Amino acid sequence: MLNSRIYIISFLFLLNSFAFGNLIRPSDGDELNYIHILFEWEQQPDAIGYNLQVSTDEFFNNLILDVDETYTVYIDSDNFNWNDTYYWRVRSIMDCDGCEYGDWIGTSMFSISQSTPPYIDEGVEIESSTDIYQDDLLEDGYVAIGAFSPGPHSFIIDKYGNEIWNSGILLENEGWFSDGFILNHINEYGNISGYSGLNYPYNTGMKANTDMDVVWSTMNPEPVDMHEFKQISNGNYMGFQNVYAVGPIPSDNFMTETFQMLGYQADGVTPEFPWFGQKIVEWNSDHEVVWSWNPFDHFTMDDFDNYGGTWWYSFNEGSHDWMHSNAFHFDEEESVIYVSHRHLSRISKIAYPSGDVIWNMGLPAEYNTGDNNICTDLRFSFQHNIQLVDDGDLLFFDNGNLSEMLLGDSNPTTRIRRIRVIDNSYCETIWEYELPPNLYGSAAGSVQLLDNGNYSIYTIGTGSVIEVTPEQEIIWKHTGNINSAWGWYYRAYKIPSIHPDAFSVIADNYTVDENSNNIIQISGNSLDFTIINKSGYTQPYQFSFGESTDGPPMFDYEEGDFTLGPNESIELSFAVLDGNISSTNINFSIWPVHHDYALKELSYNITTNDTLLGDLNGDGTINVVDIVMLVNIILNGEEYNPVADLNSDGTINVVD
């Protein structure tokens, strides 16, 4: 389940100690919400690789995994099951005479929680189904799904329909105020955003990691709308919140007389009924509102849905859901926001930060949703999931609730539309896909352009996620528990991995000195590290490197950044400034830019090849002269000298 704490996870490796390192994750006693397990441990001295073992018993009599790994991160996607307990350990692979393996670092235990339970209808289990029609055409990866009912919950499946991750199981307090989580966005770096009733309403707009820790949330007493919330490219966060006004009831709607029977004027003029729309809100990292856009300041209440049945809902709910804004795309390059307003069958392009409406795309004037809409020939209706793809096209899910009236369809028809807006005035259709009649989706829905050119589509029609080629061939289909609460999904995303924060750092020449201290022994003119991206995503990284001791520097202080593709590695080299300095201590911090909670803070004791710890006069031997010099350093409080710090605890005292 979700954790209510908000924190940054920092791995602190004190590698200049006597200890040989630790197992990092899973931590001892962890209960995981996924079966693709990421194992991570600290680098071991003189290791050329590592042997990882996992067993179902603490004595390791029943090994389910026995594998060698070059780096300090290993992800297994084949050997683990829901609702089970495991034990794991790691040892070094050595390259020396008579020592193939080092000692076991230790043993940790972890368990895996249960998978999402099946839906039971009158005692009968309703199962989902998954069909692969063209495996060789599929985009590699997994499908992440955010679901509405029986309360907010999310899960990820593989191409066979097997669940590999979930956001936590709803056991009680189901509904919108439960502590469940519905994902509504996963970006290109693997950041998960969505809605949760945990500590309602403070986490109704939140970002989480794979372990469902709350990485960031609005912490706002005003609830965030569940349709879309995400971190935008300027580093801030954006979402919808309801805003209210009083407006008229239309005089020519099929519900007009019903309202009049209750005493309303319903004349299309008199302000007498509560309306609400969705304002766009931007928060900075300190949870402060730094920008907002109120639709009542930019749109006229003369524009409203008069054909889609929204006033029937208004009558029953006691307020009019005027806009039902459900998606936005923030484009920092052009400094605009594209917004989908479902109940107006309208997509707007808004200048940022002025808030001026550049254009509204929607229906012809006779449908009462605006007199100056562009691209009226498209005649889309009740759309979802507007987005701008890399080449500048707009891609969205056209639910088509009004397609019979607008397009002459024989039945309501859902379409995927990829269009290009020309000169902010008219549209060119780049690609269009008409879903089969049984997949018509009157609500929700999403579409994603995949790296291989396919489209991943979710439709509430039969609760299905499909993958479609550019030639409009369905090559994969997952159908939820049909006609059940569990089948009501909201959005789906195809992703390459469930561990977007996974990376490993290896220090060259990491060894042990004659006093059993862990050190890096420089053999040339540079200190070298290898970093490998194990996340499955292309990730940018940042780092800082510097010394933690006073006196003349052995290295320059450096900060920098780089980008790695999936499973790519890079070598970072830091040049030695002064070859006469024989030892120092350095701090090396590195983190994925979009997953800064995965910060690694590394500290090392550095020596050159000819440095003998304790040899204070540099004569190549340790004798009484060095002892006298050490005593004088302690008595006189002289400047820190790493060669005198025999136990590498950062201070020089009688223990040394």
What are these regions (language model features)?
Residues 616-643, 648-656:
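Alpha-helical segments with a strong preference for the paired helices of cellulosomal dockerin domains
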Residues 4-17:
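Sec-dependent N-terminal signal peptides
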Residues 32-38, 522-526, 625:
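Short coil/turn motif common to extracellular beta-sandwich-like domains
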Residues 51-83, 95-108:
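Recognizes extended acidic, P/S/T-rich segments that occur
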Residues 21-45, 82, 101-122:
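Pro/Thr/Ser/Gly-rich low-complexity, intrinsically disordered linker/stalk tracts
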Residues 105-606:
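Histidine-/acidic-rich catalytic cores in large beta-rich domains
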